């Protein structure tokens, strides 16, 4: 039986179940092995303040190298630029929507402004790339760290002092989350003129399948 290594978030499990279903369709029996990564364990500080790399992948890669699991599923954007020696990417999913979504409380909307957000709005994101992009369009906004999985970050938007948060469209769509209670600005690089400032994370929307070398 093949062991599939995955993080335990709802989105990570969706991705693992999707691979599990594909393998079942060709007659492969599998089981999921949930692995906590450094990024899962440290939730109170931004990524730029955490030392090292592979925040959401290293522990899973270690399990592959030690043959505790047979295959891993990762969001491609979480993988380090350089592959770990002894590991390889065996396959990729079809690409989902690569856009970022600016998810705005309706009480904080100002359609006359570039981001459709009121002046001086507080936006939750822990991504340096996203912070630079947002402040390019509206220097008045304040970007503050927000951590957690997709449902957790939406709960923080509803219950804490944020006017908006940024999420990857692919994750929202995979989880089937209803965003009707919010105003949405989609940063789709296919439609926006200024590609430099609306570019998503490289490889966003792709899932990688990484096998053990054993």
Q: What does each of the following model-derived ranges do?
A:
Residues 197, 204-214:
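Single conserved hydrophobic/aromatic residue that forms the stacking wall/gate
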Residues 1-202:
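Domain-level signature for soluble enzymes in the chorismate/prephenate branch of the shikimate pathway
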């Amino acid at each position: 039986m093949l062991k599939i290594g995955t993080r335990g978030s709802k989105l990570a499990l969706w991705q693992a179940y999707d691979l599990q279903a594909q393998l079942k369709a060709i007659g492969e029996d599998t089981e999921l092995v949930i692995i906590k990564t450094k990024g899962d364990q440290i939730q109170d500080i931004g990524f730029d303040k955490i030392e090292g790399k592979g925040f959401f992948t290293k522990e899973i890669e270690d399990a592959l190298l030690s043959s505790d699991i047979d295959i891993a599923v990762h969001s491609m954007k979480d993988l380090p630029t350089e592959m770990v020696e002894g590991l390889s990417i065996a396959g990729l999913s079809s690409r989902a929507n690569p856009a970022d979504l600016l998810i705005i409380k309706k009480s904080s909307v100002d359609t006359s402004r570039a981001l459709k957000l009121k002046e001086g709005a507080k936006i939750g994101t822990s991504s340096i790339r996203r912070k630079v992009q947002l402040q390019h369009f509206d220097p008045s906004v304040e970007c503050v760290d927000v951590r957690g999985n997709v449902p957790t970050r939406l709960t923080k938007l509803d219950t804490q002092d944020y006017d908006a948060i940024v999420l990857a469209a692919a994750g929202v769509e995979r989880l089937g989350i209803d965003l009707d209670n919010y105003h949405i600005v989609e940063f789709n690089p296919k439609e926006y003129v200024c590609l430099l400032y609306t570019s998503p994370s490289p490889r966003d929307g792709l899932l990688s399948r990484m096998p053990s070398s054993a």
